[in-house]
From Swiss-Prot:
GO terms for cellular component: chloroplast; ribonucleoprotein complex; ribosome. Gene3D superfamilies: 3.40.1370.10. The gene is rpl4. InterPro entries: Ribosomal_uL4 (IPR002136), Ribosomal_uL4-like (IPR013005), Ribosomal_uL4_dom_sf (IPR023574). Its main location: plastid. Coiled coil: none annotated. Residues 64-75 have a biased composition (Basic residues). HAMAP family: Ribosomal_uL4_B (MF_01328_B). It comes from Porphyra purpurea. Residues 43-80 are annotated as: Disordered. Keywords: Chloroplast, Plastid, Ribonucleoprotein, Ribosomal protein, RNA-binding, rRNA-binding. This is Large ribosomal subunit protein uL4c. It is found in: Plastid, Chloroplast. The lineage of its organism: Eukaryota, Rhodophyta, Bangiophyceae, Bangiales, Bangiaceae. One of its GO terms (biological process) is translation. Part of the 50S ribosomal subunit.
Length: 214
């Protein structure tokens, strides 16, 4: 079941002062929200797994075609192959094989989970005016000063969501250990949940409204 909700934000300028207001209208999941968000997180986590772990069974290990010794009369336990899983250098029983860990999730479900997570993060979200014009060249110090003016803590994980990646902004931010920058159309559940605070530009907020509110 989905319900419509409107999130109201104060918009801060580059100097850290309130310059206006912005709204974000979302259709979010009411009853099963946490379940959907969890499924989306598991799906994205699984997609990062290579699934390439591989072991050889006794039939795949090279050699071992000849019986080591005759069946009876030696006093030793019977053996049919030196590649038995009981032997050193033998095959592996029930070992891992290459496989896909991917989980299916419908596009509407995925977007609903993302909107629900955005709603849950609204308390820790800061909307700011577009600031790409302030970066005529890459300069990390400029962004650190802005973070201070916005009363944010660089010791905690920050997610910066912009309309589109500006090269100078990206190069200025990427050197900061606790700050991740992504464009609105590549917003994902893992980045959103991992962040302690979320910074969204005004244009990115409009893009989120347009792209994910289907």
């Amino acid at each position: 079941m989905t319900v419509k909700t409107q999130l109201n934000y104060q918009v801060y300028n580059w100097e850290g002062q309130v310059s206006g207001n912005a709204d974000l209208n979302l259709k979010i999941s009411k009853d099963s929200g946490m379940y959907l968000v969890h499924r989306a997180l598991v799906k994205q986590s699984n997609e990062k797994r290579q699934g390439s772990a591989n072991t050889k069974t006794r039939s795949e290990v090279r050699g071992g075609g000849r019986k080591p010794w005759r069946q009876k009369g030696t006093g030793r336990a019977r053996a049919g192959s030196i590649r038995s899983p009981l032997w050193r250098g033998g095959g592996v029983i029930f070992g891992p094989k290459p496989r896909s860990f991917a989980k299916k999730m419908n596009k509407k479900e995925s977007q609903l989970a993302l909107r629900t997570a955005l709603n849950n993060k609204s308390v820790n979200t800061l909307v700011v005016e577009n600031f790409d014009t302030y970066f005529q060249k890459p300069k990390t110090k400029l962004f650190i000063e802005a973070i201070t003016r916005w009363n944010l803590d660089l010791n905690k994980k920050l997610l910066v969501i912009v309309d589109k990646k500006d090269l100078n902004v990206y190069l200025s931010i990427r050197n900061l250990y606790n700050v991740e920058i992504i464009s609105a159309d590549t917003l994902n559940i893992m980045a959103l949940l991992a962040a302690h605070k979320v910074i969204i530009t005004v244009d990115a907020l409009s893009k989120i409204q347009e792209v994910y509110n289907g």
